[in-house]
Amino acid sequence: MKESVIRKLEGLLERNEEVLALLGDASVIADQDRFRALSKEYSQLEEVVAGFKAYQQAQADLDSAKEMLEEDDAEMREMAQEEMKAAKAELERLESELQILLLPKDPNDDTNAFIEIRAGAGGDEAAIFAGDLFRMYSRYAEANRWQMEVMSCNEGEHGGFKEIIVKVSGEGAYGKLKFESGGHRVQRVPETESQGRVHTSAVTVVVMHEVPEAEAISINPADLKVDTFRSSGAGGQHVNKTDSAIRITHIPTGIVVECQDQRSQHKNRAQAMSVLAARIQAVEDEKRRSAEESTRRSLVASGDRSERVRTYNFPQGRVSEHRINLTLYRLNEVMEGDLDAILTPLMQEHQADLLAALADEQG
């Protein structure tokens, strides 16, 4: 392992010990915000520190085995050869693990996520598939013990959704779901198709991270145009009698957000503002990402809706993930929420890209 990497790991080990000592300090325990922040830092350091300690032990085992090679006893030398072989293999394994643990982490990975699903080309069939994707994400959220909340929806005439925005709350939600942004294409025979012909439809998905209130971009109220209107969604007669639905337009960017899922205008406005903040932040994030990643590709889609990321072929039971040339013949399982079969290889490829970039930087 490079000396610069060893020094970085030694610094993290030292910081881990400092944080542990601080967590036992009475003044820190009395300050809930600081205690919470240090506890989070300690848990983030724990895995890499444990890996580095194991690496140090494997290095000590290797050094010890090398000393045993100097023994006169042939049996001891043979044993030393075996121990050296095992220690070298362990060092290689741990070095690979530590390299991944040291990769720069997206600070937003642990935040909640907003998913926008919009029907594109394909009319009714696209809206129906948007509903299928919503169900797929709901199942995936359930498997991860995340909470899903519908922020806004516009139902399709024959089922599904023309557009639906949901909030996914839970640890690591954005970190996993961010890979879903992009164009999703479906190929299947619609129920209304009497000739059995396969139709192609498109749905776009945009995933954004929730912006914590403390970090939210300052939005000037003068830049907002707020309209109220009567909700057209479900919710009972009360909804249709009052102008509880909200449409907010951010004039500088042209971003428009509608929320009509709640009975209360106040709640709809609060939800619309949180989605608006996420959208504005997403625009800023993309500007930064474009500047940082202009020299290398990224598997995390920019939200460019023309970028096709995945095709779902129902007649063949096939899912094709175009970004990494992955083909799976387990469409039913994926549509039932088994997204890890796709997301895990995507994350691994993303890590490989980051490692390659890191190697280039280190020369």
Swiss-Prot record:
The modification N5-methylglutamine is found at residue 237. Residues 284-306 are annotated as: Disordered. Residues 284-296 have a biased composition (Basic and acidic residues). One of its GO terms (molecular function) is translation release factor activity, codon specific. Gene3D superfamilies: 3.30.160.20, 3.30.70.1660, 6.10.140.1950. GO terms for cellular component: cytoplasm. The keyword Nucleotide-binding does not apply. PANTHER family: LD18447P. This is Peptide chain release factor 1. It comes from Shewanella sp. (strain W3-18-1). The lineage of its organism: Bacteria, Pseudomonadati, Pseudomonadota, Gammaproteobacteria, Alteromonadales. The gene is prfA.
